[in-house]
Structure formats: C-alpha cells, structure tokens
C-alpha cells in the first residue's frame, strides 16, 4: 500500500486508513506493507526486520518503533539501518514481522514480487528470546 505515517513517532496517525485495508484480509495469515518512494517502511500491524548473510537490517526512518521492536533492538547486537527498496527485497533470506499482537513471525512468501524465505534461522533465534520473556509474565483473566 502506498502509505507512510507523516509523523512516525505517533502510532495512530492515518491508522484508520491502515485499518480499512487490514479489515479486508485475514490478519492471521497476511498483512499489508506500508511503502513510500519505493521503500518498504513497516506493515499495518508490525515492524520489519530483514536478514541477509546473518545480518539484521531495518528501514532507516519513517516508521513507528513499537515496543516489541524496541525489545528486539536490545537483544540484537547490531541492526543496520538502511533504505529497504522493494526491488531489493529478493536479496533477503528472511523477513520478520515483530509486533505486540504477533510477537515475532516469519514471512513465508510475498507473491507480488515472487519472494520466498530461504530459512528460519534468525526467526528461531528471536522466537526463543521472546518466548522466554513472555512465559515469565503473569496472566490475568478479566470477567
């Protein structure tokens, strides 16, 4: 979707437009990418981490840094910030969605550009760290 947050530090800016796209799909199986000037910024529900040659990459700017993204920033020794161009996505081995609702999820395919994940190595690494923290949390039931 050709859309970016005008002030990425504020999560809710233009969120109604994002929700209108998300409401038309099964969010447990798919998401929308927010793209501006041929650069991918984030998804409708999550931040993005790209993996190539064992290194993590993230968009340089113009995206909202969610809490789960901030958690992983502390766990990953180095995340390289760069413009993630649509035409270069085929070069990445893994694409990971990170967000409060999803935790960490591995993108299997992007049909529109014929991208397919090459492995799950970094996904498994991040999932392990995330699950350790989440499983320590108390749960409360509200009736």
Where are these regions (language model features)?
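Helix-start/capping segments and mature chain N-termini
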Residues: 1-143
């Amino acid at each position: 979707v050709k859309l970016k947050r005008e002030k990425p530090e504020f999560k809710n800016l233009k969120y109604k437009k994002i929700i209108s796209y998300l409401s038309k799909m099964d969010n447990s199986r798919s998401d929308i990418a927010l793209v501006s000037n041929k650069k991918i910024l984030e998804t409708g529900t999550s931040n993005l981490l790209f993996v190539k040659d064992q290194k993590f990459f993230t968009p340089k700017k113009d995206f909202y840094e969610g809490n789960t993204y901030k958690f992983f920033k502390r766990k990953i020794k180095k995340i390289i910030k760069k413009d993630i161009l649509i035409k270069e996505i085929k070069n990445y081995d893994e694409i990971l969605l990170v967000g409060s609702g999803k935790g960490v999820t591995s993108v299997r395919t992007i049909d529109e550009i014929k991208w397919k994940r090459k492995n799950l190595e970094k996904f498994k690494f991040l999932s392990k760290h995330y699950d350790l923290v989440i499983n320590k949390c108390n749960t409360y039931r509200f009736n």
